[in-house]
């Protein structure tokens, strides 16, 4: 029913780490997946990826555009006694949907799983 390659791509993409300013991981996943569907792939210094699929006719042309980053947060404080973190959003976020959200905190020593409470 569904293309297994497409399902695996979406799984890898949604599980990748890509908040604003750190889009390299999801960009690499998209680039790898799309190269088999494109005649040309260009990635600029800012991380934008352009895929070109050449058609047979001059018109019409279609542009599909989107962003590759996800909403993230920056840790702004750590309570040494409880281990609770305070944080500020990077990008837009709806405060009312934060409770019970699973998060990944990327540190110099590796990723840490957490839940917003």
Positions of predicted regions on the chain:
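N-terminal hydrophobic/helix-forming segments and targeting peptides
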Residues: 1-117
